[in-house]
Amino acid sequence: MPYDDIVESINTWKSKVYPKTTSIFGGEPLLHPRLTDIFGEVKKAWPDTTIRLITNGYLLNKMKMGNFFEHTPFEMQVSVHRLDHEHIINKNIIQFLKHYSDWKIVKVNEAGVGHHVYVWQRPGFKIWKSKFGQFVIPYNTEGNQLVPFKSNPKEAHSICGNPDVPILYKNKLYKCAPIANLLDLPNTKGFKYKPIEAFDNVDAFVKMIGKPESICSMCPESRAHASDHYAKGEVHVKHLD
């Protein structure tokens, strides 16, 4: 999103919601030319919020990393998308860590899907590297159309990867990132959802965070519709493939 649109959204909502954690993700947020300015706007609106940057880590070595440490508390989740590229991500993280010498490293149990592999911590700052074996695909298909499943909302919600993460997108609040993205696409049909605007009943929306709603029926009820994250050919990286 353009920087001015992001600032407008923040200013519209800063007196309406008070997030403990504000996640910034994409796409790839490190591609945004004014990323650290966005950090500043978030902290100006919500001084006590923890900024969480979710990145694939490929561009960390090209960032002015010192600017990241000005916006604590800060977390950075580095998601590994290609096992054969993990050494590149590790190198970029190590370069980032060199800014300070007081990091504590914790190795986390590697069992399970969506686990955290390593965590680096220092006062006000945390980095973790994550691996996700599978992603549940949040739509069905009919020909070239993306259509919703007709699942039991409670069952679908029970396997959701982000069951309590609403999204602020284009100045509106959405239950989750997938529905915000799907409504933006030209080849979708059957998705019935109205996002919340600042003049709507925000309290009612907030009370349903982390709880199943009718829109959750758009996703499958089981991991049978999951995609192997590391399958050959699933993820391509420009200039590295």
Feature roles, as predicted:
Residues 136-241:
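Accessory C-terminal segments flanking Radical SAM cores
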Residues 1-158:
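Conserved glycine-rich "GG(E/T)P / GGGxP" loop and the immediately following alpha-helix
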